[in-house]
């Protein structure tokens, strides 16, 4: 077991429960035989989805600054001694809000919720005072959805 989770067994944390790991607070959203889906309890940073224009794929999560940031967070966690296998790879379906599938399905160890996941878990997600990004691209080429923290 990872030293960062030695005091918390996620199987004992109920869905919607808050736990501390990696020096941060998280909420457990769900679990299955592979592991747990968790979400940061608070906003870690404020940033644009992408800094600058990408006319070919303006709302593509794979090319976003948000995912670069989260990749750096993962690197920091592992550099500080957290085993990489603590972060179980999971698939994110990048189907847009109109049903188009040109962005495909990607796999990450740390990522964003999709619009469907937000709809499924919104009752468990703590309220925050600022909007936050979702992985699901809009059907238009200009935007990605935001979740407004007030509900």
What are these regions (language model features)?
Residues 2-151:
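Collagenous Gly-X-Y triple-helix signature in extracellular proteins
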